[in-house]
Amino acid sequence: MNLYVVTGSTRGLGQALARQIAARGGDRLLTIGRAPGDATHIEADLAHAAQVERAGDELERRIAGAAFGRAVLFNNAGVIAPVGPLEKVDAAELERNLAVNFVAPILLMRRFLRATAGVALRRVVNISSGAARRPIFGWSAYCAAKAGLDMASRVVALEAAGRGLAIEVSSLAPGVIDTPMQARAREASAEDFADIERFKAIKAEGTLRPAEDVAADILRLEAEGRLAGDPIQDLRQIA
């Protein structure tokens, strides 16, 4: 039996990951997020560090004494707002973006690695973005947070290798997916989001991938051990 922990599981890619893990059976699934859920869910608003820490406590409590072949964390939760030139955006939205997209994944990596110290193989899959690797007009917070997550992933991988620990870390850009986050991005004005017409065209042309297909690719690659190696990865290059 393996352990899978998924954040942001109420919609989009996270929901697809959680559904497919649950459907195949045989493994332990825990989800973390602010919406209420079933017995596999740990409720926490990832914008608040204190709630993330409490989620870490609950994770430790729930898996105490259990034996797992491997443990996998999918840091998937994310928000796109605020969108617009930096001087125009709301400070509270800016803070929330950085908290959800950057601070929470790092805190959860920390608690996950502590909680699973006795597991022979541990994997962290941080859902990154192409926006981590190129600037996008109007996305200062999102780009910065995802770029920071890329670097944090590289550091954690380096620390694991330097101590001879079986910890594999991937910061994975999944490509363009048909999710609520994409829909919200298309609602912005051209003044705030210079790429708005390109994003609308991608939707109109039908080139956004269904979240279920992307989740299936990610889970297959994880099962095959193909998310190891270079921590900075792009699903479109390895699927």
Language model features by range: what are they?
Residues M109, A145:
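Active-site helix of classical SDR
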Residues D38-A50:
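Rossmann-fold cofactor-recognition segment
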Residues S129:
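Residue(s) in the substrate-gating loop at a strand-loop-helix junction
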Residues G25-A39:
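Conserved glycine-rich Rossmann-like NAD(P)H-binding loop of the short-chain dehydrogenase/reductase
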Residues T10, G14, A18:
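N-terminal Rossmann NAD(P)H-binding glycine-rich loop of SDR-like oxidoreductase domains
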Residues G84-L86, E93-E95:
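Substrate-binding pocket helix/loop in short-chain dehydrogenase/reductase
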Residues I167, S171-L172, T179, E187-A239:
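C-terminal helical subdomain
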